[in-house]
Amino acid sequence: MKTKIIVIVGPTAVGKTALAIEVAKRFNGEVVSGDSQQVYRGLDIGTAKASPEEQAAVPHHLIDVREITESYSAFDFVSEAKMTIEDIHSRGKLAIIAGGTGLYIQSLLEGYHLGGETPHEEILAYRASLEPYSDXELAHLVEQAGLEIPQFNRRRAMRALEIAHFGQDLENQEILYEPLIICLDDERSQLYERINHRVDLMFEAGLLDEAKWLFDHSPNVQAAKGIGYKELFPYFRGEQTFEEARESLKQATRRFAKRQLTWFRNRMQVTFYQIGESGVQDRILSQIEEFLDD
């Protein structure tokens, strides 16, 4: 029997953390971060980690598990998330995956091949090469490969092509979980306003000092490439004014949010909820309760 888990995704600044904490309190759960940047110690403000008070109220996992000089990949996330979920489930609690790194979360849910003779990065690279194709083009590739997919959808097509390309058996792609995937969204103008406001709050909380520390110590590491830091480096080099750098960060974050939504819409089977609608949290909690009771 597959383990039931709750997955909360959506663009940055939409309220994933707050909802995950509420779900954890309501259903005796623990939160597993699905964010590629929150793994780094010392990068707290720019990655929008749950506050110490929030982490004290509900157990959080896969936060602060790497030094800024260390790398982190989808392989690392899947391996560590699987162990974490197993531990949470063994204690009779509900695992709640919350984050905005679509590749990591999709890798976990779809059981990406993490061993065997084919290097994991080759598989991810092949999948990435399929992403630009439209549904019709993918269907044509599937037909050319002589594959049959009942109830065609994009996810099945990409997976079938991957298996055909690398010669892997379907059984090797182990699906361990039965997820309920909730995607939070907002009206575009409202979301962008939330993003701009959050960036302002980050600066008030000390983002500039955090980014300067990273710039001074490890400007070329993977951790420094995340949105929230690299946009400020031109200011530290004297190439931009502070206001220009702040606006650059807001713009980059808005673009990132758009890419996140595109990923969740096209790559994952999600249930969308508009956070601005009346009673939306109650509807989400009701859906989760029905899912867990089923």
From Swiss-Prot:
Q: Give cofactor(s), names only.
A: Mg(2+)
Q: Can you state which reaction this protein catalyses?
A: adenosine(37) in tRNA + dimethylallyl diphosphate = N(6)-dimethylallyladenosine(37) in tRNA + diphosphate
Tell me its EC number(s), please.
2.5.1.75
Keywords linked to the UniProt accession:
ATP-binding, Magnesium, Nucleotide-binding, Transferase, tRNA processing
The residues that the entry says bind ATP are: 10-17
Site description Interaction with substrate tRNA, residues in chain = 101, 127
**Location of the region described as Interaction with substrate tRNA in the Swiss-Prot/TrEMBL record:** 35-38
Enzyme class (EC, first level): transferase
Q: Does this UniProt record's set of keywords contain Nucleotide-binding? A: yes
Q: Where does substrate bind?
A: 12-17
Single Gene Ontology BP term? Answer: tRNA modification
Q: What does this protein do?
A: Catalyzes the transfer of a dimethylallyl group onto the adenine at position 37 in tRNAs that read codons beginning with uridine, leading to the formation of N6-(dimethylallyl)adenosine (i(6)A).
Family per record: Belongs to the IPP transferase family.
Task: Tell me the HAMAP family matching this sequence.
Answer: IPP_trans
Name of the molecule in the record? tRNA dimethylallyltransferase
Q: Which organism is it from?
A: Streptococcus pneumoniae serotype 19F (strain G54)
* Gene designation per UniProt: miaA
